[in-house]
Amino acid sequence: MNVPGDLRYTKDHEWVKLLADGATALVGITDFAQSELGDIVFVELKPEGTVLGEQEIFGTVEAVKTVADLFAPVAGTILELNGVLDAAETVNQDPYGEGWMVKMKVADPSSLDALMDAAAYTEMIGG
């Protein structure tokens, strides 16, 4: 299972990557999550400009087997949706790269410190 060391992780299998400006982050689902979901057929996300609280639902992922909610790992505002997700299988193929879900302005960048690092996430998923 691929768990990049430069990301932070949630118990709900989302990842967060703080960008160079220190206030903007990319959010997506982990390799473990996409593997458990199976073939992803549709991704629905809240619109740009949506203000989210920590753990607030920001969208859903529909797979052949199930539908799963997406939870905001930190509070912030959605700045951009990943347009590539019209081809939802991108999430299965590249969950940490082209398959990111939203770009968001993080309300408090230090809140990422409360999320799991790669070692803790790997332990949680039994890796």
Swiss-Prot record:
What taxonomic lineage is listed for the species of origin? Bacteria, Pseudomonadati, Chlorobiota, Chlorobiia, Chlorobiales
Chain ranges passing through the membrane: none
Does the keyword field hold Cytoplasm? Answer: no
Cofactor binding comment, as recorded: Binds 1 lipoyl cofactor covalently.
Q: Which HAMAP family does UniProt cross-reference here?
A: GcvH (MF_00272)
Q: How does it assemble?
A: The glycine cleavage system is composed of four proteins: P, T, L and H.
Biological process, per Gene Ontology: glycine decarboxylation via glycine cleavage system
Cofactor(s) required for function per UniProt: (R)-lipoate
What CDD domains has UniProt attached to this entry?
GCS_H (cd06848)
Organism expressing this protein natively = Chlorobium phaeovibrioides (strain DSM 265 / 1930) (Prosthecochloris vibrioformis (strain DSM 265))
Protein name in UniProt: Glycine cleavage system H protein
Q: Which domain of life is it from?
A: Bacteria
Q: What does this protein do?
A: The glycine cleavage system catalyzes the degradation of glycine. The H protein shuttles the methylamine group of glycine from the P protein to the T protein.
Report the InterPro entries cross-referenced here. 2-oxoA_DH_lipoyl-BS (IPR003016), Biotin_lipoyl (IPR000089), GCV_H (IPR002930), GCV_H/Fam206 (IPR033753), GCV_H_sub (IPR017453), Single_hybrid_motif (IPR011053)
The record, for SUPFAM superfamilies, names: Single hybrid motif (SSF51230)
Domain Lipoyl-binding, residue spans:
24-105
One Gene Ontology cellular component annotation? cytosol
